[in-house]
Amino acid sequence: MNNPEWTLVLAFVWGAIWGSFYNVVIHRLPSGASLSRPPSHCPACGNTLKPWHNIPILSWLALRGKCGFCETQISIRYPLVELLTALLSAALWALVLQADGGTLVSEVGLLALVGPFMLLFAFVGALVVITFIDLDLQIIPHKITVPFILTGPIAAFWLEPITGLTWSTSVLGAIAGGAVIWLVIEGYFWVRKREGMGGGDFMMLAMLGSWLGVECIIFILLAASL
């Protein structure tokens, strides 16, 4: 355990597995469909996928991007979401390992960092799902943003040694994020007499503020103004 870098491979695999599930969430959540039933199946022929058809990234490559039954072309976005989530997971674990200059892991032990990593991974995973749903349908589901707005201050108790974010700055970030986007929405409506953003944007910025703090909101505003 003196060289925990080997666990980056585990973090990559962990992310790929969840990336496969996120593909299901992205496809089913907006319509209110069950995330567990029916099992993963080919949208063209309807056949339920075999376990070996559902191995993240590798199955798509082995099947050359086709259904294992009817050989209908399967979108490359499925393995890309899995790969993206795997890379984010590995990067996030590397960030956790380097917390406090890399001394935190030697002070508390590797296993003690798994919990904070899981919290951060859940947040990052939610952002992945939101991003692709927004790309597809131009909506940001409240089913995802609201729970993360509410849990941000609670998560801060465990994440403070890693992120430096306290529960109070988390609350302030959520309020600031929501207030800023509300002012933008109201200002746009006042000038243009029509809506420019929806309530989803309001919730999204509040969610980011809740988990990343006020500094994140300032950075987003500066980046958006460029």
What is each PLM-predicted segment?
Residues 22-77:
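Membrane-proximal soluble regions of multi-pass membrane proteins
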Residues 16, 20-24, 90, 174-182, ...:
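Transmembrane alpha-helical segments of multi-pass membrane transport proteins and ion-pumping complexes
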Residues 41-44, 66, 101-110:
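Membrane-interfacial, low-structure loops and terminal tails that flank and connect transmembrane helices
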Residues 102-107, 111-112, 117-226:
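Functional transmembrane core segments of multi-pass inner-membrane proteins
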Residues 21, 84-105, 153-157:
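Membrane-embedded alpha-helical segments in integral membrane proteins
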Residues 1-17, 153-163:
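Hydrophobic alpha-helical transmembrane segments
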Residues 3-7, 73-78:
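N-terminal membrane topogenic signal
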Residues 76-84, 142-144:
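Select subsegments of transmembrane alpha-helices in polytopic membrane proteins
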